[in-house]
Amino acid sequence: SAAQNLSPAYPRRAAWGTAGSLRAWQAAALGQYLETMPQDFLAVATPGAGKTTFALRVATELLSSGDVHKVTIVCPTEHLKYQWAEAAARVGIHIDPSYSNSQGALGSRFDGVALTYAQVAANANLHRARTDQARTLVILDEIHHGGDALSWGDAIREAFTPARRRLALTGTPFRSDTSPI
């Protein structure tokens, strides 16, 4: 698949196309994921270790097998939405980074959307309805931000409880306050 050509640490480390295979942790985690096919999976790796590459590899596997039909990526900032969409496009996954809550329906040319945590919190019911409409993989990037505002954590639960699969990513699997991740 196209994901096999994705640099293990895209976009920040290895130059595009220079890394021919997954890093050891990515390969081990992918094997565990595909063997167990969990509804929820947490990948913890240091910044720059290749969490994006790992998540997109999982997404390509699940999409190509038909296990999921749509992908939703949730991240902390607008800028990251566009980074995710660009990385996903390189492996053949078409993500709409400019999707807005006022749009409602997603264009048929897209395999999914990229959202911010604040965007989900602003209309959790909309995102739950979208998640209910198709077998969806939800990638929660920098999931430790899910506890930044109580409403964000509540909205994540409300919007994505019906997801077929949820893949949480973090380089910081803890918080300095009492909010849960």
Predicted region positions:
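Conserved pre-motif I regulatory segment
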Residues: 5-44
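Short loop/turn elements that form and flank the Walker-type P-loop nucleotide-binding site
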Residues: 36-38, 67-68, 108-110, 132-134, ...
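Walker A/P-loop
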Residues: 37-58
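Hydrophobic positions in the central parallel beta-sheet of the AAA+
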Residues: 43, 113-115, 138
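Conserved Walker A/P-loop ATP-binding site and its immediately adjacent core
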Residues: 52-57, 67-90
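Inter-Walker segment of RecA-like/P-loop motor cores
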Residues: 88-125
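SF2 helicase catalytic motif II
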Residues: 117-119, 128-175
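Short regulatory helix/loop adjacent to the ATP-binding pocket of P-loop NTPases
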Residues: 175-181
